[in-house]
Amino acid sequence: MLTFHHTCIGSSHLASGRPCQDASFAGTIGDLHLAIVSDGHGGAIHSRSDVGSQLAIYAVQGVIENHPLSDWDNADKRQELFQEIVESWTVLTIDHYYDNLTEQEIAQLPLFPDVEQSIRNITVLYGCTLMAACVHPDGWFAFQIGDGKCVTIHPLQTDLDFPENNSKFLIPNSKLVTEAIPTDDRCFLHMTTSLCDPNAATEFRFCGGNKDTMPVAIFLGSDGIDNSWGTDEALHNFYIEVLKHCTSAENVTHDLADALPQLSQAGSQDDMSVAAIVDKDLLAKNIAHLIRYQIIHCEQDINERVQRQEHLASLVISLKQQATLPEYEGNENLQRDIDYHYRQLEEVTNALERLSARLSRLQSQIHAHHQSDLSHQ
């Protein structure tokens, strides 16, 4: 089993001098493989959330190894786990707060505090989201409060004999890649549930399974990652590309350290964290299926853009013909329409060139994999 993680500060945080709000962890504790990501909310209200996210990592590490995760589908046991994580994080935030009081905070301490309200005021300062995934001897389990996405990549369930360069034998909508943790409508735009919520333990979502449903990989990504890709398909493709570099934890972490700052600059400009657990044996058996999955979606994208290209080309020709009519001579609105749709046509044509180049790369990868399999037979 391979575990790895990386966190990078967002380009907007670098530019403004704000601290990185994300924290992550991946590793093995006994017979438990664990990945964790937490994202502090930031802003004046959550002024210590960069610390809160790191404390969330510590809370999960301290609690989870003492819980039998085979009980994940028992509602009472599961709720106990979530409650203990929230309570542990709360204690850690209170300890940190009183160990690091500013002079202004000391001056504002009430003589006879309302304990419950004081705890609430403290935890809000450290507010953050939390995601964790575990692979244990009996199966796997993942849970989350707040935004970000957990993406699971699964083995193909049937052994198909794929002809060379023929991807049609793999059903496009087969659930090779899923977001198994249910979504939460309360996590929208800049709104999110949080460890600092009054009833945080009841706001966790989860998924899991036994050994027979073990994923090839479980990826956790903070919202800075998924907000950079625009579509779920693009996000899933990113994680499949990461899997192709999973020769070792060191190599893939090095690649993420190179890629994430560039992604932040071009995308969300937010902090970014990825943590993952990868079953290397399952990956070796399924990497060809994943490449074919990419080929299918690339072919679909090409077909959609070809149709769009044909539509725009026909529209531009029609508008240009219309512009030759005497009654439209010098019509500025018509010329603006022609210019606009011509720019759209250029964009689609450029996108098609990029997709065609990508399809060629993927076909080369599947051919190389096929040749490697033949050489080992």
Q: Would you name each region that the model predicts?
A:
Residues 1-65, 148, 197-208, 268-275:
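N-terminal entry segment of metal-dependent catalytic domains or homologous docking segments
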Residues 4-18, 103-123, 127, 152-213, ...:
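PP2C/PPM family metal-dependent serine/threonine protein phosphatase catalytic domain
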Residues 23-26, 128-135, 140-144, 149-154, ...:
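Short beta-strand scaffold segments in enzyme catalytic cores
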Residues 31-33, 138-141, 215-217:
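Conserved catalytic motifs of the protein kinase core domain
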Residues 35-39, 143-145, 219-221:
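Short hydrophobic beta-strand that contains or immediately precedes a catalytic carboxylate
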Residues 58-101, 170, 238-261:
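Helix-loop-helix
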Residues 94, 99-116, 165-170, 316-339, ...:
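Flexible coil/linker segments and helix-coil junctions enriched in charged and small residues
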Residues 192-377:
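C-terminal catalytic subdomain
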